[in-house]
Amino acid sequence: MTSPYLVRTSSISWRQGLSALLLAAATAGMTLTAHAEPTLYVAGVGGSTEQMYKTRVIPAFEKAHGVKVVYVSGNSTETLAKLQAQKGRQQINVAMMDDGPMYQALQLGFCEKLTDAPVYQDLYPLARLSPEATAVGMVATGIGYNEEAFKKRGWAAPTSWTDLEDPKYRQLLGMPPITNTYGLHSLIEMARLNGGGEKDIDPGFAVFEKKIAPNVLAWVSAPGEMDGMMQNGDVVMAVYGSGRAVALQNTGFPLKFIYPKEGAVALQVAACSVTPNAQSELSQQFIQYVLSPEIQKIQSESNGFAPVNRTVKLPPELAARMPYGQEKVDSLLKVDWDTINQKRSEWTTRWNRTIER
C-alpha cells in the first residue's frame, strides 16, 4: 500500500519542479527580450542608393548602436503613400525622400522635430527644409547625353533646356514623366522659359505637347530603365539627375552631364524622423550619422550625391561631377513646392491626357 505521505511529497515535488521550469522559462524570455537588438526601419529609394546604404552606410551604424537596420525600398511617392497608409501606427522610423514628397509629408504632419546636434551647424542653409526635415544629399536636374553618339553624328553638345525641342532628336530622347521629379522640373523650366512658371504652367504644357513629345522615344520613370536605354543606344539624350549620371559614368559609359545655361534645378534628398516613432532616439542618431563628413563623402563617391555638409572635402575630379561648393549650390534653380504640391495631382491628370498618351 502506498503511503499518503509519499503521494503528497511526490505531488508537491512535481508542482515545485513545474513552477521552477516555468519560472526559468519566463526569466529566459525576459532576458532575451531585454537583450534583443532593436530594429530601425529606414525607407529610401532602390537601385544604386539602396546598395550603397546596405553595403557602405548601414553596417557601421548597426555595429556602433547595437541595432538592426532594415532598408525599406521604394521611390519617394511610394514611401509617402506608405506613411499615409500607416498614419497613427507608423512602421517606418526614418523616411528619406525627394524634397517634393518630403514637403508633402511635412504638411501632413508625419515628421517629428529634429533634435539639436552640432552637425546641423555645418549644413548649407538650403539643406534645412524645416525644423522637422533636413536634406542629406543634393543633385542637380539637367541634361545627360551619350558623348560618343553625338561625336559620331557630328552634333555639338547640348547647352540649353530648349535643346529638348530640337527635331533632330526625334525618337532619340528619353524623358521622365512628371510623376518623377526630373520630369516635373523639366515641365516647370519650359513654362518659365515661355513666360509662365509654377503659377502658370500652361506654357510648359504647350511646349511639351507640340515640340518635346514628338522627340520622346519613351517616358521612363525608373532610373535603371533610363540607363539601360542609354546604354543600348535607344536614346542618346535624356533629362538626368547629376547623381544618376555619376552612377552611370561609374560603369564606364560615356555619359556627359551638362548644367543648362539657364540653370540646373536643385533636387535634395531629404530625411526625417517619422512620428509616432518607437525608435525616435535611434532615428535622430541615424540622420545625424548620414550628415557626418564620412558618410557624406561615401554618398558622393558611390551615388553622386553632392554633400550638404559644408565641411566635406572632395577631390577636384569628383567635385566637378556634382553641385559641390557654395558657389555651385547658390547657382541652382529652386522651385516652389507649396504651389507644386497643391497643383500636382491636377497636372498629372492633364499630363496623362495630353502628353503621355
Write out the residue ranges for each language-model feature:
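Periplasmic-binding protein-like
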Residues: A206-I212, Q249-T275, K313
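Extracytoplasmic ligand-binding site segments that recognize negatively charged/polar headgroups
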Residues: G46-K54, Q91-Q231
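Early extracytoplasmic/lumenal segment of secretory-pathway proteins
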Residues: E37-Q104
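Mature extracytoplasmic/periplasmic domains
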Residues: V274-L332
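Extracellular/periplasmic bilobal clamshell ligand-binding domains
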Residues: P316-R357
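A bilobed periplasmic-binding-protein/Venus flytrap-type ligand-binding module shared by bacterial periplasmic
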Residues: G144-A149, E189-L193, L267-Q279, I298
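Short beta-strand->loop
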Residues: E112-P118, E132-T134, T162, M237, ...
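A ligand-binding cleft/hinge motif common to bilobed small-molecule-binding domains
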Residues: G100-Q104, Q231, V236-P254
